[in-house]
């Protein structure tokens, strides 16, 4: 048997053929831009988090009397431990940055529309899992901000009528954030990334059922090329740029995205003057603060994810690409500016004028999803280039 025949025989095996179908010979629109590379970057970030997390867990002790010191032990005594910790801590931020760009690219190019509704829904589930994973990972360092952040966020469950206090006690494993809470959060933080891997594979399989969208929103069976080698090379450029960007944070600004109070051991007696979550929680924190009543603030969080889930089912877009929808472009950039404003408001103290200003961005955020169907109707006069039967 020749080498070529042996290679072809291997590609026909079940696992090899699946990998070949989805990662090598996968038909891809020829006009994809670099914005379509953030999906593979997110996968790389997930692998980095799992690998560094496993090695860090080998040296971590999930006990309230030892957790903080075990983290310092990793930093001071374990060879390369500082690199592992900074890669893991900053890797979480890089992961969220990449996923945010991936989400906003999908919003701009309407990649969520028919027939890819399920792809979008799985993406929202993955995003929600990422938020929970990030929160459970913020507690194990057991610094002052970790302790009080866990106390404040878990206490929000008490706003649920009837069963709220019971849920809080169950989350804590007692009547306050203590050793049981730390063990639970550490265990969940170790488990959730592997659930994320499974959800990501489902997300990829759902995407490959109908194929990728493209910047023009034009579906064509003819104008497609195999993923390898063309887009591997294109993605490789993005991977190198990401590696440089990631390295700058690790080696030159490893603590910029953290909080200095987390270098103080957790102490339930003094309350920090300003409890601030990690930057990726700031928009949610701003929405929570925008409504004075705690129950109202908690209730405002659910519609954020409901709107993201419902967006693919707004059957109103005759033209998919924002290149042909100037009104949608303007609304999109307004949403992006609003998202940045939410992040800025979330890190400000709860005082005037930030309280008043903070009530405007959540309104604009929900307004975006309310008016999204309108530009699609207005733009129906522009030629509809998408002719796939699945979208009729």
Swiss-Prot record:
Co-factor note (free text): Binds 2 heme b groups non-covalently.
An example Gene Ontology biological process: mitochondrial electron transport, ubiquinol to cytochrome c
Domain of life of the organism encoding this protein: Eukaryota
Gene3D superfamilies referenced in this protein's UniProt entry, alphabetically: Cytochrome Bc1 Complex, Chain C
Key words of the record: Electron transport, Heme, Iron, Membrane, Metal-binding, Mitochondrion, Mitochondrion inner membrane, Respiratory chain, Transmembrane, Transmembrane helix, Transport, Ubiquinone
Cofactor: heme b
Subcellular location: Mitochondrion inner membrane
GO cellular component: mitochondrial inner membrane; respiratory chain complex III
This protein's record includes keyword Cell division: no
Record field: transmembrane: 38-58, 82-104, 119-139, 185-205, 231-251, 295-315, 327-347, 354-373
Positions bound to heme b b566: 102, 203
UniProt-listed InterPro entries: Cyt_b/b6_C (IPR005798), Cyt_b/b6_C_sf (IPR036150), Cyt_b/b6_N (IPR005797), Cytb/b6-like_sf (IPR027387), Cytochrome_b (IPR030689), Cytochrome_b_C_euk/bac (IPR048260), Cytochrome_b_N_euk/bac (IPR048259), Di-haem_cyt_TM (IPR016174)
Pfam family, one: Cytochrom_B_C
List of residues binding a ubiquinone: 208
Membrane topology term: Multi-pass membrane protein
The keyword Membrane is annotated on this UniProt entry: yes
Binding site for heme b b562: 88, 189
Molecular function GO labels: metal ion binding; ubiquinol-cytochrome-c reductase activity
Matching PANTHER family: CYTOCHROME B
Binding partners and assembly: The main subunits of complex b-c1 are: cytochrome b, cytochrome c1 and the Rieske protein.
Family: Belongs to the cytochrome b family.
Note: Heme 1 (or BL or b562) is low-potential and absorbs at about 562 nm, and heme 2 (or BH or b566) is high-potential and absorbs at about 566 nm.
Function: Component of the ubiquinol-cytochrome c reductase complex (complex III or cytochrome b-c1 complex) that is part of the mitochondrial respiratory chain. The b-c1 complex mediates electron transfer from ubiquinol to cytochrome c. Contributes to the generation of a proton gradient across the mitochondrial membrane that is then used for ATP synthesis.
Protein name (Swiss-Prot/TrEMBL): Cytochrome b
Organism: Pisum sativum
Taxonomic lineage of the native organism: Eukaryota, Viridiplantae, Streptophyta, Embryophyta, Tracheophyta
